[in-house]
Amino acid sequence: MKNAWMLPLLAALAGCATPTAAPVLGTRPSYLESVTADVPNGAALRHRIWTPALDEGYVPQGLTSAGAHLFVSSYKPTPDLKANTGPCRVFRIEIASGTIAGHFDIPPGTCTHSGGMAYLGQGKLFLADTRALFLIDVDKALASGTSAGASKSIKITGELRGSYATFDGKDPWIGTWTKEQPKARMFRLDQRLFDEFDGQTVRENRAAESIPVPLEAQGAAFDKAGNLWVSASNGQWGKLYRLDRQGAVKAAYDMVAGLEDLTVDEAGRLWGLSESGTRKYLHWPTRFPHIFQIDPARLK
């Protein structure tokens, strides 16, 4: 009992202790002992969720939101992890818990990378693959586990490339990942293309508009104020840009390597994800296979 006097002091110190970081939601991969703790602007990356099906080898690419859920499009490198293409799968994830709440596959051979997604409202999901675009009835696809019989599609050629996708509230957009400045552009499309050209091929002359974007762009999202956020990355670095509606860069921030697609949810919150730390990219110096909310006010 001689140390009983210490109990109130210890209780007081415990109350003043710095709170631990919030746990990462979702399913932690079995192969990853730790993640990179110090990533650029890490203080702005909140509500972290493990990207889906990491143990199965899926590489996350596209990201969009609908109500209480996020949707992630991924591909499974095939025949092995050296491949940059493979079967595509779309996962639905509960924002609050990080739990996978269903998934569906894109028919084999029709999608190989699933670079970007955008939710267009009324149950319609827009998915961009390198040379194909899909308009998917989400409820039907989730119910059957496949988008077969639940989608329309068009092939794209010429300057059109489905490296990523977004939605401005009226029209879907697609953009090109490239290291060549003249080719670094986003294109605004009309949803009616899926009615007029379902199963056919279109090129850039069918785009309603195009604007320039930064090099090596991986994702894009319009916020409620009309800003266009664009992500760019490779295995060594990541960038987050804020552009105006005409494509002029207004701000740039360092971000986690492997930063892929972006989305803005119904509450106006900006989200992103990184493909670093997936089985395919374990040789990268960064391991951060998370979906995360980005707080613009904390970016430096």
Spans of model-derived segments:
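Conserved beta-propeller blade signature
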Residues: 70-72, 124-127, 172-175, 228-230, ...
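Surface loop/turn motifs at the tips and blade-to-blade linkers of beta-strand repeat domains
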Residues: 51-55, 104-110, 153-158, 208-214, ...
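A short helix->beta-strand "capping" segment at the edge of beta-propeller domains
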Residues: 31-56, 203-205
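Structural motif
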Residues: 81-89, 132-138, 181-190, 236-241, ...
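Residue-level detector of Asp-centered blade-edge/turn motifs that repeat once per structural unit
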Residues: 65-67, 119-122, 167-169, 222-225, ...
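Beta-strand-rich domains and repeat architectures in extracellular enzymes and scaffolds
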Residues: 48-86
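Repeated scaffold domains used in trafficking and secretory/extracellular systems
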Residues: 57-62, 111-116, 157-167, 214-219, ...
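Loop/turn-rich, solvent-exposed surfaces of beta-rich toroidal or solenoidal domains
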Residues: 207-243
